[in-house]
Design a protein with these regions (language model features):
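Short coil/turn linking the two alpha-helices of tandem helical-hairpin repeats
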Residues: 76-78, 112-116, 143, 147-157, ...
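N-terminal leader/linker segments that initiate helical-solenoid repeat arrays
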Residues: 24-104, 288-291
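Short solvent-exposed coil/turn linkers within tandem alpha-helical repeat scaffolds
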Residues: 94-101, 130-136, 155, 176-195, ...
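Terminal, low-structured helical/coil segments at or just beyond the last alpha-helical repeat
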Residues: 181-182, 194, 198-203, 207-210, ...
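Residue-level recognition of tetratricopeptide repeat
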Residues: 110, 144, 148-151, 206, ...
């Protein structure tokens, strides 16, 4: 298993792309149009409304031109990523003091992530957090993405993990305090909170994992996979959970996590199937530690 782990995480190319691909796809599929607009409730799906979770809302526009520019940006579908990025960048350049900066940057976070532009995603995300510290979705996205994009050779490696830990913990702490918006049903609100918490716990778990704190990582990944409402589970969470379980000699738990990963279609299936087999062998020849 150690050889597989070195190939997939330290050499890093395959899993790094997979890590970013999973969170990028989640951000793109979980985003409707701009999260701060308020179209009629019947025109929004549960997943669209789940992406409006924040304590912060923009104040009234300063002038009609700024208002029109924001509405033009807001009207561009999230699926037209290049056009929406261009419009968002033009908006923040033209209106650097706009009261709409937080929602524009919040959208840019998701767009940059979907485009795998991690540095721009982080820059935009940190601007959002400075403007709207209670934007729990942005906190969770930053908290999950930074440790997934991380490698030990980065010049600011320790600082990046510290930031990810702070973002994830803030999202976990703040999400339960968010009041339900009037436009959301109870089901939509629960979905939004659970999506956010799943990302935040995953991010915090990976921070601990990167630091070699496997016992601390395990409950975070367990909570992430427990609350994640997405019908397509993220195999990466089960994969890293399995390795953490194996590292702490919880071989039966490692087999269970590897098996869940192997059941999810995707590039990790062969690796997780092999991991389950190897964890079974280790469990048969080595003493398991109590959970």
């Amino acid at each position: 298993m150690k050889g597989t782990w070195l190939k997939c995480m330290e050499a890093g190319a395959f899993l790094a792309l997979l890590l970013l691909g999973c969170v990028g796809a989640a951000a793109q599929s979980g985003s409707g149009q701009s999260g701060q607009s308020s179209p009629p409730a019947q025109q929004q799906s549960d997943k669209d409304k789940a992406n409006t979770l924040t304590l912060d809302t923009p104040a009234p526009p300063v002038n009609a031109e700024e208002d029109a520019a924001f509405k033009a940006f807001d009207s561009i579908p999230i699926t037209d990523g290049a056009k929406k990025i261009q419009a968002g960048e033009a908006f923040v350049q033209k209106y650097p003091q706009s009261r709409y900066l937080a929602p524009v940057y919040s959208n840019l976070v998701k767009l940059y992530l979907a485009a795998s532009d991690i540095q721009k995603m982080q820059d935009a995300g940190e601007k959002v957090v400075a403007l709207a510290p209670n934007d729990v979705q942005t906190l969770a996205i930053l908290g999950q993405t930074l440790p997934r994009a991380w490698n030990s050779g980065m010049p600011n490696a320790a600082q990046q993990l510290e930031k990810a830990e702070k973002f994830s913990k803030s999202a976990i702490e703040l999400t339960p305090t968010i009041p339900k918006p009037d436009a959301m049903t109870d089901a939509q609100f629960s979905l939004a909170k659970n999506q956010t918490l799943a990302m935040a716990h995953s991010g915090l778990g990976l921070v601990y994992f990167r630091r070699g704190k496997y016992d601390d990582a395990i409950p975070e990944f367990e909570e992430s996979t427990k609350v994640d409402p997405n019908p397509e589970a993220d195999p990466v969470n089960f994969y890293i959970l399995a390795i953490a379980e194996e590292k702490t000699s919880h071989f039966d738990a490692a087999v269970a996590a590897f098996s869940k990963c192997a059941a999810i279609p995707g590039g990790l299936q062969p690796t997780c199937k092999n991991g389950a087999d190897e964890a079974k062998k280790l469990g048969a020849t080595q003493l398991s530690a109590p959970k």
